[in-house]
């Protein structure tokens, strides 16, 4: 493939919108399901082969790993927006400069975040008042996950680049390979070698590293037009770095700001005891799995909007928004019905049936959150559309609203209503985010359509 080739087969500016969105979202969904299988394998193996105490230890780290890992993920995936806009507009020189400056940005994120988080992990757990009987295991798990952040950055930067091209199939294939490795390595290190929670953490980061390396090799071989052809394209460019930071940092902050609310929530869940922590942990794993299709649709929509924004096809952006929301709402109704009738069976994936209290907490959480999926479909559709147009900074406002919602429920309701309030948290949080991001999308879309056409 020559450097000037436009890769028309990955363009989203022409053709049937629903088919494009679903064909792109399909591999992304599979990749996200595989990513969740990572987490489910860890939790299921730890819960079934170690103990509910070990599961609680892993669960006690979830909000911390969420805020740190998702800051890195959001920051790295953010490169897909300026890259997709340059690609959609046919500006390959700009595309190469965004790519190389994105590499510099990702390296800085990896080094800084690893050094800070790994050295402060014990202090973080102390601030969260992690129960003493699970503190040691939680600390071991957290340190290993944080030391593996460079591998998380590698995979998600490559994922962001592939999303810019509308190429979601290969990254999914690589994730499938690493997921199989993760499950077998999990079983080997936890069950055979007896490394405990440390084995689960090592399996996770090693396997993600495999996906990252495979993705990087694939990009190097297929997308030759990304790589600089002269010294000017290889050097640091303040203009391109500024645009990358303007897009990537808000996305990273939006993910992490939302997670700050989750940390406050985790603080109050920890106060409810070991059984509540284990139930919340297993319920949250299932929730993340159920929400994968909505995330995949949002990711597809972001790339779709980015390319069509670059091509000034606002008619397709509007139609893409409507089609994505319709699909999301249909899916939400289906999952609500499924969760109500199969919640107990889902809980038994993680928890022994003899742990009746933990099973009860898990089932209650699953059934509650399934009611709120329709809200999340609207939230994701609006948020990913705003990000695709290159205005990720406004996602921070939505993230702040969600953070405030989580914090308010945790502080005001959990002390009085206990675990029930933990379950209500999701719905109230989503409503807060919608109240902010939906008006922003409508105003932005109308303004940009008038000014650019």
Where are the regions that the model predicts?
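Helix-terminus/linker motif at the lipid-water interface of multi-pass membrane proteins
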Residues: 37-56, 125-132, 188-195, 256-285, ...
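Hydrophobic transmembrane alpha-helices of multi-pass small-molecule transporters
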Residues: 67-70, 114, 182-186, 212-216, ...
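N-terminal transmembrane alpha-helices
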Residues: 12-50, 63-78, 82, 107-114, ...
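Short runs within selected transmembrane alpha-helices of multi-pass transporters and secretion channels
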Residues: 76, 144-163, 171-179, 200-215, ...
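Transmembrane helical elements of multi-pass membrane transporters/channels
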Residues: 23-42, 144, 155, 178, ...
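Short alpha-helical transmembrane segments in multi-pass integral membrane proteins
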Residues: 1-25, 83-148, 192-249, 305-372, ...
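Interfacial/gating helices of multi-pass transporter permease domains
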Residues: 46-66, 132-137, 197-198, 240-247, ...
